[in-house]
Amino acid sequence: MSRTAIVFREEVLLHDTGPYHPESSARLEAILEAFERHKIDPPVLEIEPATREDLLRVHTAQHIDTIERTCRENLEYPDPDTVMGEASWEASLLAAGGAISACKAVLEGKYDSVFEIMRPPGHHAEPNRAMGFCLFNNIAVAARWLVDVVGLKRVAIFDFDVHHGNGTQKAFYDDERVYYASIHQYPHFPGTGFPEERGKNNTNLNIQMMPGVPKELWHSAIESLILPEFKRYKPEFLLISAGFDAHRYDPLGRQNLEEEDFAKMTNAVKGIAGGKVVSVLEGGYNLESLAESSVAHYLALDNEI
């Protein structure tokens, strides 16, 4: 039996971003179809939606109220790229709560790792701001639950999305209980994530990749910069912001990674916290490369490649 579960709920497909938006339900449908095509039948975790208390550990009350009101009353979006409608409120609570439920399952020993295949994504959402397709910061909500509720002292977040996770950095920049490490394209949206930004007691790390660099640079940066930092930090739990938009065919990035590179990155970091890993889907907008990269990532988590 697989030791790696997934998180998925059909309700998140109802988060309607319109016919031309890159972050659509077709992304998740493509991933699940690829799992079926590869004859992968992972266990699906039962989850609970995030509570207001869960969200308040990361987000301001004003932000939470604004998102709820915008969704329920169909108001003008706070950010033009970040579309939301009536079903978006439930989807966002399930995406954030699913990350917490995944962490619970790993801590309880039910699974070694969990891959959350949900939407909307989260790493651009700041404590008081929705942006970049993200309403709430799913991985930050999970990390704050791990340190505030469970009482872990050191949680690591590895973000390999082609875009810098400005929201995650902002949430934990002054909190040494969470080490945020991002490798991302620069210059690129959202224009953040600089190497000199090291956070409290050097628990923030940004590695910038110029557009079009050889994919080998990604792997050497992980081996020579991120892994030594994580080993020094000795995390008790690893969270991964799994964005697949650094793939060579992704329309929102200009990098050269392929499916096997996401598996290689996953294998490089997955053991850093004794094998306790929860991965949360972020970006990836070419449906075929997103789907195949997600399969490779899952198989690496499950020790199959």
What residue spans do the PLM features occupy?
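N-terminal low-complexity, Ser/Thr- and acidic-residue-enriched intrinsically disordered segments
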Residues: 1-57
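A general "terminal functional-core" signal
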Residues: 2-6, 13, 37, 65-305
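Charged, often glycine-rich, active-site loop that binds/positions anionic groups
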Residues: 48-72
